[in-house]
């Protein structure tokens, strides 16, 4: 930590460069999490289903599948991805977005996640003073990136990410983080109850589900990290971003009105903005409108 402080004050360009490069590698790992975690959960659910409803069915012995095993490979030709082909961002550019084995296109989202993770991390490093708070904010940022893309893909916010994020926020603030422990606990409770109440009010009025329970847990986690004071701005920003994005998708005819839109990404975006600039936005609003 002392070395980071010296770099940040003496050689800020080197400090930000190291944050960028390290976060590119984190983004590469997040791609693995985004792709594999839903598959791991699906396999787990299938195994639980068999154990409850078909206890005599032993199923098929499947090879291990987790975040480390098996080795990453091309989904089209099973060409194993070598170390040189797995350099964040650069490998995709070097391969021109195609598999070295079969020349099948590689989704541009892989380098996008890596670059987005790196840029958001640099923004955190430039906005917050170097210290444990910056490291905690980086961790929060990385988990929010993973949750955003999983929800976009699968309409799912896994408990395996939201619950550790919630407890991590409480623990961080217990140790003297962004807010007091009392504010963090109230933030977690209020975050969950607000969306839970909206969910049931909407369901009673329309008979439809407006959001999932993962959204409750994500807002609770943001409340645990940022305190209850940040919840109004998180809800306001997420609603505004969600409304603009939803209207834009409908106008572009890329989205049918009856098709659900994941709310988790908008909560994640709003939570990240509140993390860095929530106090400034609140002061600006109070100064100009109240």
From Swiss-Prot:
Record has NAD as a keyword: no
Domain of life: Bacteria
Cysteine disulfide links: none
Membrane topology (UniProt): Multi-pass membrane protein
Listed EC numbers: 3.4.23.43, 2.1.1.-
Pfam families, per database record: A24_N_bact, Peptidase_A24
Reactions catalysed, as given in the entry: Typically cleaves a -Gly-|-Phe- bond to release an N-terminal, basic peptide of 5-8 residues from type IV prepilin, and then N-methylates the new N-terminal amino group, the methyl donor being S-adenosyl-L-methionine
Binding site for Zn(2+): 74, 77, 99, 102
One of the record's GO molecular function terms: aspartic-type endopeptidase activity
Keywords carried by this UniProt record: Cell inner membrane, Cell membrane, Hydrolase, Membrane, Metal-binding, Methyltransferase, Multifunctional enzyme, Protease, S-adenosyl-L-methionine, Transferase, Transmembrane, Transmembrane helix, Zinc
Membrane-spanning ranges: 14-34, 106-126, 130-150, 161-181, 185-205, 232-252, 261-281
Record's subcellular location: Cell inner membrane
GO BP terms, alphabetized: methylation; signal peptide processing
Cofactors required: Zn(2+)
Main location group: membrane
InterPro entries: Peptidase_A24A_bac (IPR014032), Prepilin_IV_endopep_pep (IPR000045), Prepilin_pept_A24_N (IPR010627), Prepilin_peptidase/N-MTase (IPR050882)
Family: Belongs to the peptidase A24 family.
Function: Plays an essential role in type IV pili and type II pseudopili formation by proteolytically removing the leader sequence from substrate proteins and subsequently monomethylating the alpha-amino group of the newly exposed N-terminal phenylalanine.
Name by which UniProt lists this protein: Prepilin leader peptidase/N-methyltransferase
